[in-house]
From Swiss-Prot:
Name of the protein in its database record: Phosphoribosylaminoimidazole-succinocarboxamide synthase
Molecular function terms, GO-annotated: ATP binding; phosphoribosylaminoimidazolesuccinocarboxamide synthase activity
Gene name for this UniProt entry: purC
Gene Ontology BP terms: 'de novo' IMP biosynthetic process; cobalamin biosynthetic process
Family per record: Belongs to the SAICAR synthetase family.
């Protein structure tokens, strides 16, 4: 399968395929935090992220969620449907943590009565600012119907993920999703789902996600390996 590099990101490289509607995503051994300010090469991270994300997307596909995932090709590669990415990070919070706690001056780990969905404008030059529905419409990113769908689909995905992670003894604190338009103009889930873009705590409150790297709490791959081993219990 011939391929040409079309995009190189912080965590993945994207390549063309012989089918114009399909791409290959290759996961890197690179860890970044604070929008790339902190950056390190972490051996084995790409393999773990690809394993975890492929597993989660397969389960989401089976549960009826429309995603870009087609199949896992190798240890670090997966075949995906090509999408036009919507320049929004859709964040869902089940508990207070991270920037939410800092923004509102509250402790981490407080359960939210109703999960909160937030939008962040995907723009590195602007440091991905927090925006609301009106900003989304002003920037012509999405209309009212599309905004409602993004929120509804994110909440539906959350209900699935919470159950799966609870079954393996992990609490889903929050996560970030990205969506895109497929060749038919349908909004589908894209990007990845791994400890890179979610917060997971175990029963003792230990971080099982990229906060280990952000906050210097331990070895990233050790934690990701534990998450991967636990996920396989769901099979």
């Amino acid at each position: 399968m011939s391929k040409q590099l079309i995009y190189s990101g912080k965590a993945k490289d994207i390549y063309t395929t012989e089918d114009e509607n399909l791409i290959i995503s290759t996961y890197k051994d690179q860890a970044t935090a604070f929008n790339g300010v902190k950056k390190e090469q972490v051996a084995g991270k790409g393999v773990l992220n690809n394993q975890i994300s492929s597993f989660i997307f397969e389960k989401l596909n089976a549960a009826g969620v429309a995603t870009h995932f087609v199949e896992k090709l190798s240890d670090t590669e997966q075949l995906n449907k090509k999408v036009k990415i919507i320049p929004l990070e859709v964040v869902l919070r089940n508990y207070t943590a991270g920037s939410f706690s800092k923004r509102f001056g509250v402790d981490e780990g407080i359960a939210l009565e109703t999960p909160i969905v937030e939008f962040y404008y995907k723009n590195d030059d602007l440091d991905d600012p927090f925006i609301n529905d009106e900003h989304v419409k002003f920037l012509q990113i999405a209309d009212d119907q599309q905004i409602a769908y993004l929120k509804e689909e994110t909440r539906r995905i959350n209900e699935l993920l919470k159950v799966w992670f609870a079954e393996i003894g992990l609490k889903l604190i929050d996560f970030k999703l990205e969506f895109g338009f497929d060749k038919d103009g349908k909004i589908i889930l894209a990007d990845e789902f791994s400890p890179d873009n979610c917060r997971l705590w175990d029963a003792d409150g230990n971080h099982m996600d990229k906060d280990v790297f952000r906050r210097g709490l331990g070895e990233l791959t050790d934690v990701y390996e534990i998450v991967w081993e636990k996920l396989q219990e769901l099979k």
